């Protein structure tokens, strides 16, 4: 560098850089309308000063872009050039025009890069001071909401809705409730797939044992019947009448992926089928799925048919505690029966001479014992754990004896006691998962009337991500083998999930935060032998006598000899 070369003062250099960022940032932001409770879209129209670079020949567009460099009008938020169509309307569509920052002076070369000034001299480009117009449609939902909500209260409310089909579900509390109409309208305007916005009036389950909640339609059409896809399956239900949480999709996938071909699974509080249907469709589990809510049951029946797993998922409509015991009895009764599943599309030709892609029919034998129970009713599912006491009393010979080696003749063919997955809430977050686990363990022990202990705590979201990454690596390796790029030895072993439990040991897994002081957990454990084989008391209460009588009637009923069927008393 020559001694005569002027060196820019670092302070001036920083100031110049700051202006390049702040000036367009201020220009392109939505106008402030703090306190706007009724959305006025016209109020967001604003005029901004710019310099328009008119390019004479389209072949010079890239050259002008490069020459303009730092004086391009960029949106600092998304780091892209502002679209001329956005600023200049029809003229921006019809001509080769690029917007520049207003600090560029049309007749002052010192305010622009030298290369751009040279192109002007060559008559390749012409600079014109020009006003641009921005309207409501040009601003994102975050910008609009930031401009109307109190600055000290805005916390990303635009991200705070759950999308269920065409419905956006909001939870608005405190001062935000005063802006509910404006917030709802912005959400429906800025999200093309949203046709209805609803807000929860009361907490889930506050007025219904079915986990439904009273809701208010804030914007859009009054239609709560939704159709959506989740976990590779399709669902249809009335969002106002059943429970559904789209944020649990990863958890649905995680548990469904624990199931294997031919496993008998009991989904005690199945809802419309988000655990049961993926477990059957993707992993060929045989799922006995129950929900007490009649609307959930009817939706589940439709969803089972729509996903073509009618022979694999058996919907029921009864009390969960009753279902645990009756389904276990019925499973034992029907053990050994064959279930046939056709994996081919309904309309596919069944002649292999015509259809080269025809898959063979799959057959599964009904086992004597459920491999796992799923209990997704976090507010009260743990209260149903007492139904497992004595569930297999008198049937000890069906199960492996921990004191014997699996090499003992006949021992390996016996069953292991089922794994229980029960969901619950706790006030502690993931940061205090050990404290949460202690409290949950005490509660579970109480309902089982057996001293459980915590073997491990887990972040289930991390486990799911890791398992999906491992599955992706495995699939990529298999593709490489098929294409001849890799040998079969390059395929990694399928990742195994740790489902080993000591007697009375349990894992407590963090699922998600529901509220600042409320988190959802999944407790998993193998049913302790002492609980499973516990002999019932000799004296039964009146309610227990009634249930025993109902069981006897159901198990003897000629109408229920065809399994599966709708369990009703």
Indicate residue ranges for each PLM-predicted region:
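SAM-dependent transferase fold signal centered on methyltransferase-like domains
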Residues: 1-569
């Amino acid at each position: 560098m020559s001694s005569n070369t002027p060196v820019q003062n670092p302070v001036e250099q920083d100031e110049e850089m700051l202006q390049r960022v702040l000036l367009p940032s201020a220009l392109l932001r939505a106008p402030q309308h703090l306190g706007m409770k009724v959305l006025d879209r016209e109020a967001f129209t604003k005029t901004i000063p710019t310099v328009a670079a008119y390019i004479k020949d389209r072949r010079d567009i890239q050259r002008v872009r490069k020459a303009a460099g730092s004086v391009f009008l960029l949106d600092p938020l998304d780091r892209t050039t502002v679209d001329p169509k956005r600023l200049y309307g029809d003229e921006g569509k019809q001509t080769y025009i690029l917007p520049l920052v207003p600090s560029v002076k049309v007749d002052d070369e010192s305010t622009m890069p030298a290369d751009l000034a040279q192109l002007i001299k060559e008559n390749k480009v012409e600079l014109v001071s020009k006003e641009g117009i921005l309207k409501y449609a040009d601003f994102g939902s975050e910008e609009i909401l930031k401009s109307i909500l109190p600055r000290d209260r805005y916390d990303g409310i635009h991200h705070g809705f759950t999308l269920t089909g065409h419905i956006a579900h909001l939870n608005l509390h405190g001062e935000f409730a005063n802006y509910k109409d404006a917030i709802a309208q912005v959400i429906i305007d800025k999200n093309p797939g949203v046709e209805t916005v609803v807000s929860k009036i009361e907490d889930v389950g506050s007025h219904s044992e079915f986990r439904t909640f009273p809701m208010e339609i804030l914007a859009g059409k009054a239609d709560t019947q939704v159709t959506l896809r989740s976990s590779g399956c399709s669902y249809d239900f009335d969002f106002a009448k059943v429970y559904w949480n789209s944020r649990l999709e990863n958890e649905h996938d995680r548990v469904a992926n624990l199931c294997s071909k031919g496993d008998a699974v009991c989904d005690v509080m199945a809802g419309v089928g988000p655990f049961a249907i993926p477990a059957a469709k993707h992993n060929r589990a045989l799922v006995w799925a129950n929900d007490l809510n009649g609307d959930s049951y009817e939706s589940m029946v439709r969803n089972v048919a729509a996903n073509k797993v009618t022979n694999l998922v058996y919907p029921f409509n009864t009390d969960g505690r009753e279902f645990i015991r009756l389904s276990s009895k019925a499973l034992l009764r029907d053990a050994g029966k064959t279930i046939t599943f056709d994996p081919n599309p309904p309309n596919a030709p069944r002649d292999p001479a015509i259809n080269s892609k025809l898959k063979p029919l799959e057959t599964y034998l009904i086992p004597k014992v459920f491999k796992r129970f799923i209990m997704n009713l976090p507010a009260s599912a743990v209260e149903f754990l007492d139904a497992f006491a004595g569930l297999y009393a008198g049937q000890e010979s069906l199960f492996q004896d921990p004191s014997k080696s699996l090499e003992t003749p006949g021992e390996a063919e016996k069953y292991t006691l089922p794994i229980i997955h029960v969901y619950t809430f706790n006030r502690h977050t993931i940061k205090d998962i050990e404290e949460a686990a202690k409290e949950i363990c005490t509660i579970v022990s109480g309902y089982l009337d057996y001293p459980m202990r915590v073997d491990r705590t887990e972040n289930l979201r991390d486990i799911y991500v890791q398992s999906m990454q491992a599955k992706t690596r495995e699939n990529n390796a298999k593709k490489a083998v098929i294409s001849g790029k890799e040998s079969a030895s390059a395929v990694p072993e399928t990742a195994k999930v740790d489902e080993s439990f000591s007697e009375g040991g349990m894992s407590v897994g963090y699922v998600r935060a529901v509220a600042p002081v409320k988190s959802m957990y999944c407790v998993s454990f193998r049913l302790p032998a002492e609980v499973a084989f516990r002999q019932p008391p000799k004296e039964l209460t009146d309610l227990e006598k009634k249930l025993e009588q109902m069981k006897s009637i159901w198990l003897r009923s000629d109408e229920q000899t065809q399994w599966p069927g709708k369990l009703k008393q």
